[in-house]
Amino acid sequence: MSEEREPIDAIVVGFDEQDRVLAQPTSSVTADPTSLVGKEVVYLDYNGNPWKGVVREAMEDVLVIEFEAMRAGQEIPGLGQGSLVRISV
């Protein structure tokens, strides 16, 4: 029987040259951070609209997140350094 785990919160610390989000988990990840690659990420903008992304890479304590909207050239309202994103585990 699999148990439902709480999502992991992460704080946006920057962006890379491909406009992907760089985020650090707010608590230590017990498993190998690479186990989060492929997991769904949700950001709620200031209007409560959910924006979905995916963890693409894990580099030490930084996760690289790609949002479909940003890849399509769309800006996500309010997403910036210090924003909170949630990773489903």
Question: What annotation goes with each model-predicted range?
Answer:
Residues S2-P7, D45-K52:
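Short coil-to-beta-strand transition motifs
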Residues D19-Q24, D61-A69:
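Short, solvent-exposed secondary-structure boundary/capping segments
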Residues S27-T30:
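Short amphipathic, basic-aromatic surface patches that mediate peripheral association
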Residues P33-L44, G78-V85:
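Short coil-to-beta transition motif at edge beta-strands of beta-rich domains
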Residues V42, K52-V54, R86-S88:
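Ser/Thr- (and often Asn-) enriched beta-sheet segments in non-cytosolic proteins
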Residues L63-V89:
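C-terminal structural segments of small proteins and small subunits
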